Amino acid sequence: MKKNLEATIEEIVTKITDEHGFEMVDVEYVKEAGEYYLRVYIDKEEGISLNECELVSRELSPILDEKDPIKENYFLEVSSPGLDRALKKDRDFVRYQGRDVDLKLYKPLNGCKQFEGELVGLTEDNNIKIIANGKEMEFNRKDVAIVRLAIKF
């Protein structure tokens, strides 16, 4: 149910973001502290502004009210994915090749669940490839809990 709902919302959001030259990055529908939140993450090549997030929110809200895909009361949040954005879609792994990433596994590999390195990209088998400590490593996507852009100070 949740995946179908998120896919429906993604379709609606994508129509709006495409119209403005933005990218629909992700949609999350979560319950936190007894409240429901619909979080929509958008971006563009040079970064998304607060005004652009507000624009999408104002256009999205009446469409969601009309189509009513969510039966519960919820809060709508539209924002950028942040500096440490999660990489989820194939295009993310292409766009951020060469960038440093933090990769976390569901289960330890050789006693380690966290890896940091340079993103090489996706293999033909759809595995994630990074260079960590000068060594090329490949991870099956189903074993990876999350990949985020690393923030370096």
UniProtKB/Swiss-Prot annotation:
InterPro entries: Ribosome_maturation_RimP, RimP_C, RimP_C_sf, RimP_N, RimP_N_sf. It comes from the Bacteria. One of its GO terms (cellular component) is cytosol. Pfam families: DUF150_C, RimP_N. The keyword Cytoplasm applies. Belongs to the RimP family. Required for maturation of 30S ribosomal subunits. HAMAP family: RimP. This is Ribosome maturation factor RimP. It comes from Clostridioides difficile (strain 630).
